[in-house]
Amino acid sequence: MLEFLSQQKPKILIIGDFMVDNYTWCDCSRISPEAPVLVAKTLKEDKRLGGAANVYANLKSLGADVFALGVVGDDKSGKFLQENLKGEFLIQKGRKTPFKNRIMAHNQQVLRLDEEDISEILLENELIALFDEKIKDFKAVVLSDYAKGILTPKVCKAVIKKAKALNIPVLVDPKGSDFSKYSGATLLTPNKKEALEALKFENLEGENLEKGIKKLKEDFSLRYSIITLSEAGIALFNEGLKIAPAKALEVYDVTGAGDSVIAVLAFCLANEIEIFKACELANEAAAVVVSKIGSVSVSFDEIRSFKSMSFEKKIKNKEELLTLLKQNDKKIVFTNGCFDIVHFGHIKYLEKAKRLGDVLIVGLNSDASVKRLKGESRPVNSEFQRACMLAAFYFVDFVVIFDEDTPLELISFLKPDILVKGADYKDKLVVGSNLISRVELIDFEEGFSTSKIIEKIKDKK
């Protein structure tokens, strides 16, 4: 599929809130004598395409022939967008084009300064007329809504009605709690928070996810209903609920991930790719984007490289792992074991452990450690083979091998937020529990154990 898509150049039109993302990179190494605040020394500035313009950049990077339609102010940011995007922009005098200045220090965002006008545009009729004039030449339309006043109910309804009459798919990245202005679109891509606000649900856990995503499809007459679930992937409701699991290995910055998702979906639908396959590809694109800093675009070459990346990269030593963990403010879950012959019970256990936090680390006993604990005939599989099997599961973020009989030293070194063990430790002391504030015991699936599997194999011989 990637080979086919990388050779296509579909014409895609984008309407929405085109913005400028500015990054001011600073060095913050001292406190001001005037007040208890950081002193930031500017090192460099980096101006990028943001909002709908970032969707444009993603589509262009994928190889699409992209055209932008929008309204900007008569200011520097509006001029920057006109100079860097192919399209047509109506100029509304006195309007501030959205400009977001992110102050960055040591790869962390410490402050954001916004300049914008979020009132509804005065040029609705002119924008609709411009769309009507251009639309017939395109294979897909994207509405990128950041609630900055461009995509008014009148504009959205007119665009969707016209595109639908021409059988052109309309994909919407929505904003706000009222999705009625998007009724009749091909699909929406709300994240979990946006979906909850629109549905007035308390949560989207368990059965609520299927109820909610189906309700969105029915209430707003969508062809497909989608909810992006961050680290859990993308939920799709067509004839039933399906979830495309997330693919990210390391997350540095989620800025622009949603833009990449809708760009890939639009590119795929413009080329008549089956929707679930499109969602899987969108997940892979998002994984590439969140591994970078800032609003960035993604290409098919990067996705291809990501897909070919070996899961062996998830196997780290403790020093490498600590460095990675320090770069992210994530809830760390730790569990450990021999995992000699991985079975269904292990899979369910690790899947449940992952749900407790953001990053799941599995401490794996080395071959020497297993031999001391289990006897000379073990392990059946080498430590590298066992580590690779664990790393192949999407819900395992990292595997670290330790040589000691217990993971105490490793737990002390990594300092995870949550320590997880099986429910059989209910009346036992969990190693490392004195170092960690939260310990969770998870029930095992009955009837599954490595020892039983080994005995069963021996009996058959």
Swiss-Prot record:
GO BP: ADP-L-glycero-beta-D-manno-heptose biosynthetic process
E.C. designation(s): 2.7.1.167, 2.7.7.70
Keywords assigned by UniProt, alphabetized: ATP-binding, Carbohydrate metabolism, Kinase, Multifunctional enzyme, Nucleotide-binding, Nucleotidyltransferase, Transferase
Positions bound to ATP: 191-194
Catalytic activities: D-glycero-beta-D-manno-heptose 7-phosphate + ATP = D-glycero-beta-D-manno-heptose 1,7-bisphosphate + ADP + H(+); D-glycero-beta-D-manno-heptose 1-phosphate + ATP + H(+) = ADP-D-glycero-beta-D-manno-heptose + diphosphate
Gene that this polypeptide is encoded by: hldE
GO cellular component, one term: cytosol
Subunit structure comment from the entry: Homodimer.
Family: In the N-terminal section; belongs to the carbohydrate kinase PfkB family. In the C-terminal section; belongs to the cytidylyltransferase family.
Entry-linked InterPro entries: Bifunc_HldE, Cyt_trans-like, PfkB_dom, RfaE_dom_I, RfaE_dom_II, Ribokinase-like, Rossmann-like_a/b/a_fold
Region Ribokinase: start-end pairs: 1-312
Native organism: Campylobacter jejuni (strain RM1221)
Function statement: Catalyzes the ADP transfer from ATP to D-glycero-beta-D-manno-heptose 1-phosphate, yielding ADP-D-glycero-beta-D-manno-heptose.
Chain positions covered by the region annotation Cytidylyltransferase: 334-461
Pathway given in the UniProt record: Nucleotide-sugar biosynthesis; ADP-L-glycero-beta-D-manno-heptose biosynthesis; ADP-L-glycero-beta-D-manno-heptose from D-glycero-beta-D-manno-heptose 7-phosphate: step 1/4; Nucleotide-sugar biosynthesis; ADP-L-glycero-beta-D-manno-heptose biosynthesis; ADP-L-glycero-beta-D-manno-heptose from D-glycero-beta-D-manno-heptose 7-phosphate: step 3/4
GO molecular function terms attached to this record: ATP binding; heptose 7-phosphate kinase activity; heptose-1-phosphate adenylyltransferase activity; phosphotransferase activity, alcohol group as acceptor
CDD domains assigned to the protein according to its UniProt record, in alphabetical order: RfaE_like
Stated name of the protein: Bifunctional protein HldE
